[in-house]
A protein has these predicted regions:
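PLP-dependent amino-acid enzyme catalytic core
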Residues: 1-400
Length: 400
């Protein structure tokens, strides 16, 4: 399995190289050169696999240059800190199923990917004898999950930028109370997009990146997306045992990483296993406007909401989807991204029909978020966090 850039400017590289490179050297994002496929027969074999065993099978399809025993060990260590034996259990609540992604050490869904990525980094650095300075930006949950993924690990320093007073209090405390010597927290006077822009600028300076051995832990790193692909397949298998042959996923979305993992899972699985991917946003709705209007443009300033991890206007992973929209033509992706960087806008109205086939989408207001939390607590004695409430409300409104 080789990896290429969405902008077409690098030679194919290995999985090991992709993990360590993070952002491609031409400024693009890394993707597999080709996508494998999972047959119905394979799903039958995997039907009763534990989460870690399934993760081994899925990741092994993408990491052919890593010994299988080593990968197995990394996966076991990554998920040993989770509080639930199923890692990402599914709970029926009302007429919906909720995939619980909060059983990791920081209670954030990003623990699923970042516990694995931290172990991958340590493994690669031990092999090479090198070191890494991880630079990342967070709107809340990435920062604490990233820190807990690499705290105390040899050969790694981590620098996390977060928007000052724009994360939840518990997220700020999770980050700033970690006292390990390799952890550095930096508050930025601005939004998540401002922090992310600093990170991208640092990675675009190739001399600086090479001199200081920068590594990426944000969802621009392909390994993070890949780790999330696993739980979509796990959910399909679990619900398949209950007789469901086709499943809709509603995904609270800010940076487009989690729902893009669902998009990749749908490409891997037999046709029809994943029917609809519902892209749920809060009032920072650039992605909803893209799906419904073909308009991918920054609309004013980021609006602070009750779901701060989605308070994003520039979705870093969108470029990966754009690559597939453009028929895997890196030159067209590069041109579009340069236009967006210069103007804050891309006219993608020509892709409205394809986007509507790939996604449904709805923006959820603060009032709707609160009402959904209240409804689920009163009816089901189940307390939703605001991000989950956004996903549930979108699913309710777009039910077919």
């Amino acid at each position: 399995m080789k990896y290429i850039s969405t902008r077409g400017g690098i030679e194919p590289i290995t999985f090991d190289q992709a993990v360590m490179m993070g952002l491609a050297r031409d400024g693009g994002l890394l993707l597999p050169e080709t996508l494998p496929s999972i047959s119905a027969q394979q799903l039958d074999v995997w039907q009763n696999f534990h989460y870690q065993t399934l993760a081994l099978e899925v990741l092994d399809m993408f990491s052919g240059d890593m010994p299988r025993n080593d990968l197995d060990d990394l996966i076991e260590r990554a998920y040993s800190s989770f509080r639930h034996p199923q890692i990402t259990p599914i709970r029926k609540t009302g007429d919906l199923y909720i995939m619980e992604l909060f059983h990791g050490p920081t209670l954030a869904f990003k623990d699923v990917a970042l516990q694995l990525l931290g172990n991958l980094f340590e493994y690669e650095l031990k092999k090479s004898g090198g070191f890494m300075n991880i630079i990342g930006a967070t709107s809340g949950d990435t920062g604490s999950a990233a820190i807990y993924g690499v705290r105390g690990k040899k050969g790694i320093n981590i620098f996390i930028l977060h928007p000052h007073e724009r994360t939840s209090p518990i997220q700020a405390l999770q980050m700033t109370t970690v006292t390990d010597a390799n952890v550095f927290n930096i508050a930025v006077n601005g939004t998540f997009d401002d922090a992310q822009a600093i990170v991208k600028d640092l990675f675009s300076d190739l001399e600086f990146k090479d001199t200081y051995q920068l590594g990426a832990i944000n969802s621009i790193n392909w390994a993070r997306v890949l780790a999330q692909v696993v739980y979509y397949i796990f959910a399909v298998l679990k619900l398949r045992r209950q007789g469901f042959t086709s499943i809709d996923f509603s995904v609270p979305t800010g940076n487009f990483g989690d729902i893009f993992a669902g998009y990749i899972a749908r490409q891997l699985l037999p046709e029809g296993c994943i029917k609809r991917l519902i892209l749920a946003t809060n009032s920072n709705d650039i992605l909803t406007r893209f799906v419904t209007q073909g308009d991918y443009s920054i609309a004013g300033k980021v609006t602070p909401t009750l779901s701060p991890s989605m308070d994003i206007q520039i979705a870093s992973n969108f470029e990966r989807y754009l690559y597939y929209l453009h028929g895997q033509d890196g030159s067209r992706v590069k041109a579009d991204m340069e236009t967006f960087a210069a103007t804050g806008s891309m006219d993608l109205s020509a892709f409205r029909e394809q986007a509507a086939l790939d996604f449904a989408s709805r923006s959820v207001s603060e009032e709707e978020t609160i009402a959904t939390i209240r409804e689920y607590y009163q009816k089901h004695d189940y307390l939703l966090d605001p991000h989950t409430a956004v996903g549930i409300r979108a699913a309710q409104e777009l039910r077919v």
